[in-house]
Amino acid sequence: MKQYKILLIIADGLGDRPVSKLNGLTPLEAANKPAISDLLKSSMIGLMDPISPGVIPGSDTSHLSIFGLDPHVYYRGRGAFEALGAGATLKHGDVAFRGNFATVNNDLVVVDRRAGRKLEEGEELVKELNEKIKEINDVKIRFYKGTEHRVAVVLSGKGISDKVSDTDPHYEGLKVLESKPLEDSTEALRTAEIINILTRKVFDVLNSSEVNKRRIEQGEKPANIVLLRGAAHYVKLPSFSSYTKLKAAAVSATALIKGICRELGMNVVTPVGATGGIDTNYNAKAKAAIELLKENDFVFLHIKATDAASHDGLVEEKVKAIERIDKVIGTIVDNVGRDNLILMFTGDHATPVEVKEHSGDPVPILLYVPYPIINDNVKDFNEKEARKGSLRIRGLDVTNILLNYSNRAEKYGA
């Protein structure tokens, strides 16, 4: 029996709701999708709950689920995955945080949570922080640059805990929060104290940085604080190949996703020009996926642009991103050959563009199979048509479904 290559494409934050600017259509409905439409003749579509109905997924928990790992078992927090994706090497006992370079005033009130989002000087600022803040109370501190405004911070030492609260207030106009212990333990209290000292030290370093002085002179907001959230102890994950028997690779520019994929043992590729944002190089991602499919059984392609547009409320940009993803799908199918490939296209969660945040809505999902199946008689691939399809699954079902239709699944039982 022929075993097929598997391509899983995730458009981050793909799912949406009717949008007033689109006369009640969703971005997926409004987008022109000729390549996807061409696959419908041999596809099943439907809806997926990344975690379970009504649960609002993070990109971390949803991807764990989609890769076949129950987040209720394996998820400890996002910080460790962000750090791994940003290039950190973690060991047992380390505590990692995800964070943003942000702008605050002298009273530590947040002016811009992302310091303008695009931060070309991020590497310089991380280097300066690492040179000037090496250790607090015998705990080593290390900063790692992520994409755009993002940064990861790793604490290494004895007697530290991830049971501490965020310093990120999550809204502008609010003061940077004081980290507090989330459990009654010496380790949590000590870690919170270290984080609060770190917050002040980071502000002192960045507020006097020559980099930020230049930014102010150029009319840009200074990146003069790091807002921390998502504390997580490092937890070792099983390798993807250990439970799927697949040689796997991933294409992504987003630190969180790269971190998860690397921890799963996938070969992670970030093509030149891939940014993890709206301005990513779609063609470079398509070419990378094509090359990886030559040597791997499973290739995961992650595109963040749809989610970035949604969080910023950019309706037209989300529609354009979907149309560019459609071209990516067409390019890959044309090069690899539709007879050699199982292709799944979905989102990791919904991010309605008028809400600007994740929601617990189910996400449309498409599964293309190159051999005769009972396909779904639908006219398009979108949230409304997906309700007519045969698939109604959870994220945890995805990996097993892909193994089954690629003729790679093993029988369960005698």
Curated annotation (Swiss-Prot):
Pfam families: Metalloenzyme (PF01676), PhosphMutase (PF10143). Keywords: Glycolysis, Isomerase. Transmembrane segments: none annotated. It catalyses: (2R)-2-phosphoglycerate = (2R)-3-phosphoglycerate. InterPro entries: Alkaline_phosphatase_core_sf, ApgAM_prokaryotes, Metalloenzyme, Pglycerate_mutase_ApgM, Pglycerate_mutase_ApgM_sf. It is an enzyme of class 5 (isomerase). Pathway: Carbohydrate degradation; glycolysis; pyruvate from D-glyceraldehyde 3-phosphate: step 3/5. GO terms for molecular function: metal ion binding; phosphoglycerate mutase activity. One of its GO terms (biological process) is glycolytic process. Its EC number is 5.4.2.12. Catalyzes the interconversion of 2-phosphoglycerate and 3-phosphoglycerate. Belongs to the BPG-independent phosphoglycerate mutase family. A-PGAM subfamily. This is 2,3-bisphosphoglycerate-independent phosphoglycerate mutase. It comes from Saccharolobus islandicus (strain M.14.25 / Kamchatka #1) (Sulfolobus islandicus). The lineage of its organism: Archaea, Thermoproteota, Thermoprotei, Sulfolobales, Sulfolobaceae. The gene is apgM.
